[in-house]
Curated annotation (Swiss-Prot):
Names of the cofactor(s): pyridoxal 5'-phosphate
Protein name listed in UniProt: Phosphoserine aminotransferase
Alphabetically ordered keywords of this record: Amino-acid biosynthesis, Aminotransferase, Cytoplasm, Pyridoxal phosphate, Pyridoxine biosynthesis, Serine biosynthesis, Transferase
The gene coding this protein: serC
Higher taxonomy: Bacteria, Pseudomonadati, Pseudomonadota, Gammaproteobacteria, Alteromonadales
Binding positions for L-glutamate per the UniProt entry: R42
Pathway: Amino-acid biosynthesis; L-serine biosynthesis; L-serine from 3-phospho-D-glycerate: step 2/3; Cofactor biosynthesis; pyridoxine 5'-phosphate biosynthesis; pyridoxine 5'-phosphate from D-erythrose 4-phosphate: step 3/5
PTM sites of type N6-(pyridoxal phosphate)lysine: K199
InterPro entries: Aminotrans_V_dom (IPR000192), Pser_aminoTfrase (IPR022278), PyrdxlP-dep_Trfase (IPR015424), PyrdxlP-dep_Trfase_major (IPR015421), PyrdxlP-dep_Trfase_small (IPR015422)
Main location: cytoplasm
Family listed: Belongs to the class-V pyridoxal-phosphate-dependent aminotransferase family. SerC subfamily.
HAMAP family, per database record: SerC_aminotrans_5
GO molecular function: O-phospho-L-serine:2-oxoglutarate aminotransferase activity; pyridoxal phosphate binding
Reactions listed under catalytic activity: O-phospho-L-serine + 2-oxoglutarate = 3-phosphooxypyruvate + L-glutamate; 4-(phosphooxy)-L-threonine + 2-oxoglutarate = (R)-3-hydroxy-2-oxo-4-phosphooxybutanoate + L-glutamate
Functional note: Catalyzes the reversible conversion of 3-phosphohydroxypyruvate to phosphoserine and of 3-hydroxy-2-oxo-4-phosphonooxybutanoate to phosphohydroxythreonine.
Length: 363
């Protein structure tokens, strides 16, 4: 069977060594005679797994001791509401920077919970002649007492990534669902980082929250206990039964990242993958990108065929070549190649070859 490269935006492909290991021990994990899916989340064996997972993530991201690491339910959308509920009690206000679909969705969820009057927004994307670019605003002259500033550094739908530091007088919260562990960051610059697991961490159903301890003293709203950060901290992310298999796979992904050289090494590979793909798009008149060079995502490469009538044929021939899930999000159309950490560079090389051949064939 020839290799298939899965460019799905999420749930995304997992590293093959992780999948192979999970397959080999699915029915007998840790020599227990049972699957990891079948054991108690409070057993000493599973607790050891969770402790190692947190230790590995702390090492990979250099997470300081004054930050808690939580493994929670709900994915990114669950955290949209959890953030507002945990931090915006007593009529708290927040500022949201909007650079695409997911930051917009976070805004709408927060407004539902605390009202439009308590959520301010700034659109930070400008479109010039069909090219989107990010323009970060000066925040020093805004005289408002926000509990936090929220933004999404990588917008999967739009293919936009923010690499610059957000200089904010308020605590910064970042939705890193799609670029966590893809490049080195300074965790100290953030009050909270959250990520749905299904892109760079593991399967869907799990979310990671990295929250600075002082944030837990902010007034909160009444909410579901399973999304209460204070309760999650108090109970070691086990106030209720967690998604154990997703946690297990996340632990294996963290271990794989360490063996692969850590975030520094993975970042270099991610730069190379994105460079090859964008170079192909730019060099051929057959394709076009709608994102400014400085804001092109390394994780989600969006592009269009100049002749959109060939879109379906492109997708069908790509599928026949073992290159799947390249269709752009339904809200924007075009193509999208999601090249998260698990995508080997060989997959990008094969995609570039296909794009070159397809362009030559139909030019």
């Amino acid at each position: 069977m020839s290799a298939t490269f899965n460019f799905c935006a999420g749930p995304a492909m997992l590293p093959k060594p992780v999948m192979d290991k999970a397959q080999s021990e699915l029915l007998d994990w840790n020599s227990m005679g049972t699957s990891v899916m079948e054991i108690s989340h409070r057993s000493k064996e599973f607790i050891a797994l969770t402790n190692q997972a947190e230790a590995d993530l702390r090492q990979l991201m250099d997470i300081p001791a004054n930050y808690h690491v939580l493994f929670m339910h709900g994915g990114g959308r669950g955290q949209f509401s959890a953030i507002a509920n945990n931090f915006l009690g007593d009529k708290g206000r927040a500022l949201y920077l909007v650079d695409g679909s997911w930051s917009s969705a976070a805004v709408e969820e927060a407004k539902k919970l605390v009202g439009e009057e308590n959520i301010d927004t700034i659109n930070i994307v400008e479109n010039n002649n069909g090219i989107n670019s990010v323009v970060l605003p000066s925040l020093s002259n805004i005289d408002k007492d926000y509990r936090y500033l929220h933004y999404c550094p990588n917008e999967t739908v739009d293919g936009i990534e923010i690499f610059d530091t957000i200089n904010s007088p308020w605590p910064v919260i970042a939705d890193m669902s799609s670029n966590i562990l893809s490049r080195k960051i300074d965790v100290n610059q953030f009050a909270l980082i959250y990520a749905g697991a299904q892109k760079n961490i593991g399967p869907s159903g799990l979310s990671i929250v990295i929250v600075r301890n002082d944030m837990l003293s902010l007034p909160s709203l009444p909410q579901s206990s399973i999304m209460d950060y204070k309760l999650a901290v108090k109970h070691g992310s086990m106030y209720n039964t967690p998604p154990t298999f997703a946690w297990y796979l996340a632990a294996e992904v963290f271990a794989w990242l360490k063996v692969s050289g850590g975030v520094d090494s993975v970042e270099l590979i991610n730069i190379e993958k994105a460079m090859r793909l964008y170079q192909c798009i730019d060099e051929l008149d057959f394709y076009k990108s709608g994102v400014a060079v400085e804001n092109r995502s390394r994780m989600n490469v969006t592009f269009q065929l100049v002749n959109a009538e060939l879109d379906n044929q492109f997708l069908e021939e790509a599928k026949q070549a073992g290159l799947v899930a390249l269709k752009g999000h339904r809200s924007v159309g075009g193509m999208r190649a999601s090249i998260y950490n698990a995508m080997p560079i060989e997959g990008v090389i094969e995609l570039v070859k296909f794009m070159q051949t397809f362009a030559k064939k139909h030019s």
